[in-house]
């Protein structure tokens, strides 16, 4: 084959005219039978390393050994596999002698013109044909040759194209049939044979190969976004036990928690379908059914009795209100799965002195009314006592930085019945916000977070006072001391517009909204309802007139005898006002007190 002929050339045949009679062969090389030249590669390999030369001064070390005492360090060559080494040998052995001729030139020499023809030195260009590739039997050597050949500087473009086509666009089982076909047609290049003959004859196989390669092609990479490396921060050590030990009830899956809470096995004698919560309370879905998150939260932490009031819905559609026995059974059932190992201190028994001291620090009101508020706290369990105190104090502390709400004004002036203060909801404590549907969507989550944080701080302070623990570390009360800016137009901004006047007294920090003279009668009466006390007396109290618009007037703290709210309103505004306005005001105040405030409607006339 062609590789054998090239091997003879390397052994000294020269490929030209034969050598005879000791005459050097063509190309300046000795005959095949003669001794190879001293500078040839074979002679260099046989003779070994050069010997040091003798000089006058001494022995000269051969090149490559440094001039110092110790020889230089020699690093091992990079590892090359056998297939790559064999491919390099094949590519080095493939050469074809090609002479590049130049056009004739006329040269002036000693006054005569003589035509001479110069020749360039021979240029060795590797020819990688189908004959050479057909002689390669190993797939690894074939792949190495196809990869290395296009990277050589003196490789022809047609050969590089042939290597790329075989390597990337042809199955291996078709390589040797193609090389055999290309080797037969020596008058045409292998690329022409591939394009005109081989591909059309094997179109189906090539289509299957293209589909296979297309399936293996990776998807386009997603656009990369620059990664912002966070600053290095040493993580804080989290003291305490692991969550599974701190609260053993977390060891069961969440689906099991929801299943147990939904069926309510502590309600004996009934098949419970679910839990019903009041409309608008936290965790209530449409229709009052409890949500999945409410079940999980009340499984992890035991809820309080009556906050909010709970009803159990049976499969027959009957609603069973929760009693004290049911609540105690609920607590025992949760504790049977594992009590909290690391928890806060238990609620101390009701302590009136600690509650009075705590309310005196945060509630701005008179001492007699403050004592009445403490006496009106529920005298049940310690948890109910501290919860009622915490919510009352949390709502009594101002939330907005630029004024007080009407609830805080009534509480300071003593206009609530003492036993009704602790049952008020956020709808009454923040009536200015909850009366506007647009304002509720923005401000209700913020108010809920503030009240929840304040309740936690008040409970912690109450337990320190009730237990007399002077060694407990006091945490900063951020929620109780923080204030946020009030929304623009706090009191019914859409209803009043410019019909309300805000008057402020410097000494008392009192903010009162009063209607202008040109305001509609409906808005004037509605604002008067918000300013009036929550418990009207049976007998008409004597009111002291005052020129100061910030003085609300002398109102009784409590009345011995009560009458329905609607009767008091009818007695106050019954003359000269239509019945439609009275009904609207009665419904409005009843909705506020019961926590079912409808969207505010300006057209009450």
From Swiss-Prot:
Comp. bias intervals (Pro residues): 220-233
Source organism, top-level taxon: Viruses
Ranges annotated as biased composition (Low complexity): 20-48
Any one Pfam family match given in the protein's UniProt record, by short name: DUF5877
Region (Disordered): 10-78, 216-248
Protein name: Uncharacterized protein 087L
């Amino acid at each position: 084959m062609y590789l054998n002929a090239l091997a003879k050339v390397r052994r000294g045949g020269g490929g030209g005219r034969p050598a005879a009679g000791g005459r050097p062969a063509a190309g300046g090389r000795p005959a095949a039978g003669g001794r190879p030249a001293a500078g040839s590669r074979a002679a260099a390999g046989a003779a070994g390393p050069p010997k040091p030369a003798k000089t006058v001064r001494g022995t000269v070390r051969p090149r490559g050994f440094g001039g110092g005492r110790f020889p230089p360090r020699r690093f091992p060559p990079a590892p090359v596999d056998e297939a790559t080494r064999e491919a390099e040998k094949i590519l080095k052995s493939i050469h074809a002698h090609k002479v590049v001729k130049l056009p004739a030139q006329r040269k002036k020499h000693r006054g005569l013109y003589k035509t001479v023809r110069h020749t360039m030195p021979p240029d060795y260009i590797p020819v990688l044909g189908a004959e050479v590739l057909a002689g390669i039997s190993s797939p690894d050597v074939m792949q190495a040759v196809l990869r290395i050949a296009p990277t050589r500087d003196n490789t022809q473009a047609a050969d590089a194209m042939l290597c790329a086509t075989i390597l990337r666009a042809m199955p291996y089982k078709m390589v040797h049939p193609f090389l055999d076909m290309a080797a037969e047609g020596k008058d045409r290049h292998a690329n022409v044979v591939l394009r005109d003959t081989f591909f059309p004859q094997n179109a189906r196989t090539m289509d299957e190969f293209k589909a296979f390669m297309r399936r293996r092609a990776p998807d386009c990479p997603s656009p990369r976004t620059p990664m912002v490396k966070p600053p290095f921060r040493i993580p804080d050590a989290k003291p305490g036990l692991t969550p599974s030990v701190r609260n053993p009830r977390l060891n069961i899956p969440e689906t099991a928690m929801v299943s147990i809470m939904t069926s309510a096995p502590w309600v004996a004698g009934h098949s419970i379908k679910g839990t019903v919560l009041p409309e608008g309370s936290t965790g209530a879905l449409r229709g009052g059914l409890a949500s999945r998150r409410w079940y999980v939260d009340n499984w992890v932490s035991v809820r309080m009795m009556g906050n909010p009031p709970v009803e159990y819905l049976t499969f027959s559609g009957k609603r069973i209100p929760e009693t004290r026995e049911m609540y105690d059974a609920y607590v025992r059932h949760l504790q049977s799965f594992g009590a909290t190992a690391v928890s806060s201190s238990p609620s101390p028994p009701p302590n009136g002195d600690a509650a009075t001291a705590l309310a005196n620090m945060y509630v701005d009101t008179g001492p007699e009314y403050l004592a009445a508020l403490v006496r009106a706290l529920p005298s049940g369990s310690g948890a109910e006592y501290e919860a009622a105190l915490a919510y009352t104090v949390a709502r009594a502390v101002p939330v907005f930085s630029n004024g007080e709400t009407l609830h805080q004004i009534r509480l300071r002036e003593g206009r609530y019945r003492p036993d009704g203060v602790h049952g008020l909801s956020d709808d009454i404590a923040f009536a200015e916000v909850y009366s506007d549907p647009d304002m509720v969507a923005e401000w209700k989550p913020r108010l809920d977070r503030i009240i929840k944080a304040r309740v936690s701080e008040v409970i912690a302070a109450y337990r320190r006072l009730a237990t007399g623990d002077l060694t407990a570390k006091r945490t900063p009360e951020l929620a109780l001391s923080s204030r946020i800016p009030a929304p623009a137009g706090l009191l019914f901004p859409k209803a009043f517009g410019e019909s309300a006047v805000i008057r402020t007294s410097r000494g008392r920090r009192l903010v009162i909204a009063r209607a202008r003279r040109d305001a509609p009668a409906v808005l004037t009466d509605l604002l008067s309802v918000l300013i009036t006390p929550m418990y009207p007396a049976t007998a008409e109290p004597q009111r002291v007139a005052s020129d100061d618009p910030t003085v609300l007037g002398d109102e009784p703290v409590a009345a011995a005898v009560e009458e329905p709210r609607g009767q008091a309103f009818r007695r106050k505004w019954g003359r000269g006002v239509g019945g439609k306005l009275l009904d609207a005001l009665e419904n409005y105040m009843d909705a506020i007190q019961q926590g079912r405030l409808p969207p505010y409607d300006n057209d009450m006339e």
